[in-house]
Regions:
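Flexible, surface-exposed loop/linker segments and immediately adjacent secondary-structure boundaries
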Residues: 4-42, 46-48, 54-192
Length: 192
């Protein structure tokens, strides 16, 4: 269970573009550069929106891109101190300090990713394309990460430069890291 005082900030907004909304226990409304981010805040970026923030305790930088919805969580009270991000839709990039040995957990509708000292990209798509597969794409840019599929309970360990798709139907699809989306579409069609 993630726990933190509702009124204490856990991150600081470092950049915004376009419309970025916040729904939380402490504040609601537009997010601006310099604003604190609180435990439990839901951040919503619009069509042209972008926001980045730095977690105060472990100096992890999180970048949230257009048309995304995330919830920011932190646990400082347990001996397993860590930050969490729940991704409901859209795309995020997480840049962890290589020296940071605390876990960062990203929860998506299809998988739970756990990383430490890693730089990675995650995108959740609920487009129901490719035989009704909704999926989450994980790419490790530097470091290592574990991804567990929520439905199947199976885990995969990823290294630098690897990309994997986790579907809500319980499958993992390994990909070459592509420069365009046609490779993703072709791999998804081959899997079915």
């Amino acid at each position: 269970m993630i726990g933190f005082s509702r009124s204490e900030n856990i991150a600081l907004c470092t950049e915004t573009h376009g419309v970025v909304q916040r729904k939380g226990n402490v504040r609601n409304g537009i997010v601006r550069k310099g604003d604190p981010i609180y435990h439990g805040d839901k951040l919503i970026t619009g069509e042209d929106g972008f926001v980045s923030f730095m977690n105060i305790y472990e100096k992890t930088i999180v970048k949230i891109y257009e048309n995304s919805v995330v919830k920011v969580l932190s646990d400082r009270k347990s001996r397993f101190s860590r930050s969490e991000l729940a991704l409901f839709g859209g795309k995020v990039i997480v840049e962890m300090d290589e020296q940071n040995d605390r876990d960062f957990v990203l929860r998506s509708p299809s998988a739970i990713a756990t990383a430490s000292g890693t730089h990675f990209l995650t995108e959740y798509r609920d487009e129901l394309l490719y035989n009704n597969l909704s999926y989450c794409i994980f790419t490790v840019l530097t470091g290592k990460m574990e991804v567990e599929n929520i439905k199947s309970g199976h885990s995969i360990f990823m290294d630098q430069g690897e990309t994997v798709i986790s579907t809500r139907e319980g499958k993992f699809l390994l990909l070459d890291t592509f420069r365009d989306n046609s490779g993703i579409a072709n791999t998804l069609m081959e899997a079915n």
